[in-house]
A protein has these predicted regions:
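Long, Lys/Arg- and hydrophobic-enriched amphipathic alpha-helices
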Residues: 222-398
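A mobile, often basic/glycine-rich helix-loop segment
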Residues: 174-222, 275-285
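Active-site-proximal flexible loops/turns
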Residues: 112-114, 142, 183-187, 271
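Conserved RecA-like P-loop NTPase ATPase core
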Residues: 83, 173, 264
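A short SAM/SAH-binding and catalytic strip from SAM-dependent methyltransferases
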Residues: 165-191, 237-242, 246, 250-261
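Rossmann-like AdoMet
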Residues: 2-106, 110-170, 331, 340, ...
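Generic detector of well-ordered alpha-helical packing
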Residues: 106, 136, 178-181, 265
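Short helix/loop capping segments that flank catalytic or ligand/cofactor-binding pockets
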Residues: 60, 181-184, 271, 385-387
């Protein structure tokens, strides 16, 4: 019997407004044209690339509201200054100990993290000469520039936007919720072969089409099975992001001296490809509703997958970086000196006390962001002399 992968419907999700629906229909037509050009199907990776990143059309290049209350999801920096302060303290170590060290942030979103880090570094008198941002969305770049000019006009001149990591980079690279956004392949394991998940069209809708995997994907699944010590079960569905792997390799190779922090929702390989995770880790976000079907509402919903931190740490290590530690977000914030946020707690008014408590709960509680989000710390030619990874480091699970 031929293996099939069914498409889920949109029941339970909010209805898009007329403007977003028109946009999604335009994206759908474009992707269908690409399917026609390819013959019968395109890889899931290509579908995702078109839906999210196609210039002038995809989700990240044309949707007005992505992050925040009026968008589809909220990231940790949007909740307040605690998260940014935690990262700023790590930045301060690098900028104070390495002459000419700079800060580079991948995918700066609304600019909230950059603003928060710069405010804290100014307070600590540890401002860098340069704060670089690599951002693929022109809409988000415009948003970031406005936010910086509004909230830290005296520091806006420090910030500049670049297209790639400079050669022989010295400083700290921060990637907050970046690794999960790279386009990825999906695969299905059967008893005798590996199938690649592709996307075809069926009248007006998209559908999945499974074909024998190419050598690269097939070899990777065989590699996985060798590492985890058993063959994946028949019908096992999962993902792999070769683009995220290539990205880590590029960054690692270009860092001459400094630190690379990858912060995202993810887990080690042993959990990622566990037997009970046979439906994979693909997640979509639409108007603050999370679901598992990427083929609906193309161009107006986010598509992500959880991060396999094991493979990213191995690639970084293979390219000259040291693994300093691996923490959940809760421990990252605690180890960064969470108590400082409560030094003047009694002097705050009731509203400010409630807001501070809310931030702490959202960022640290296991049922919020505290457990699922992780921090992988990497360094090269630099001793990260900090307490960040001294308590409850879980690098041994990678």
């Amino acid at each position: 019997m031929k293996m099939k992968l069914e498409t889920l419907n949109s029941s339970g999700l909010p209805e898009p407004n007329d403007k977003d629906l028109v946009k999604s229909n335009c994206v759908s037509r474009f992707i269908k044209q690409q399917i026609d050009k390819a013959g019968a199907r395109i890889s899931f990776r290509d579908f995702m690339q078109h839906a999210l990143y196609e210039e002038g059309l995809g989700y990240y290049s044309s949707k007005a509201n992505i992050i925040g209350v009026n968008g589809d999801f909220i990231t940790a920096p949007e909740y307040g200054e605690i998260y940014a302060n935690s990262l700023a303290k790590q930045c301060a170590i690098i900028t104070s100990e390495i002459k000419g060290a700079t800060i580079l942030e991948f995918g700066a979103g609304t600019g909230a993290l950059a603003v928060g880090i710069l405010k804290k570094l100014k307070e600590m008198r540890c401002l860098p000469e340069h704060y670089f941002i690599i951002e693929i969305s022109k809409n988000l770049i415009d948003h970031q520039k406005r936010k910086l000019k509004q909230e830290v006009p005296e520091l806006a001149s420090i910030v500049s936007w670049i297209s790639s990591v400079p050669e022989e980079f010295t400083g700290i690279v921060i990637a907050n919720e970046v690794a999960d956004a790279f386009s990825f392949e999906r695969f299905v394991r059967t008893s005798n072969e590996v199938l690649q998940v592709c996307v075809a069209k069926d009248k007006e809708k998209f559908r999945y089409d499974l074909i024998p995997a190419n050598n690269k994907l097939c070899d990777y699944v065989v590699f996985l099975e060798k590492i985890i010590g058993h063959k994946l079960d028949h019908g096992y569905l999962s993902e792999v992001s070769f683009e995220a792997q290539d990205w880590v390799k590029e960054v690692a190779c270009k860092i001459k001296s400094g630190v690379f922090l990858i912060l995202d929702y993810g887990i080690p390989r042993s959990e990622y490809y566990a037997p009970n995770r046979n439906q994979g880790w693909t997640r979509c976000h639409f108007m603050h509703h999370a679901h598992n079907e990427p083929l609906i509402y193309p161009g107006i919903q986010d598509i992500t997958t959880w991060v396999d931190f094991s493979i990213l740490s191995e690639i970084a290590s293979d390219n000259g970086m040291k693994i300093d530690g691996f923490l959940n977000q809760s421990q990252f914030i605690i180890n960064s000196g969470i108590e400082e946020n409560f030094q003047n707690f009694d002097k705050l008014d009731l509203k400010a006390q409630i807001e501070l408590s809310r931030q702490i709960k959202l960022l640290t509680l296991p049922d919020q962001m505290g457990e699922n989000f992780k921090c992988l710390g990497l360094s090269k030619n630099f001793n990260l002399n900090t307490n960040l990874f001294k308590s409850r480091d879980r690098a041994y699970v990678l």
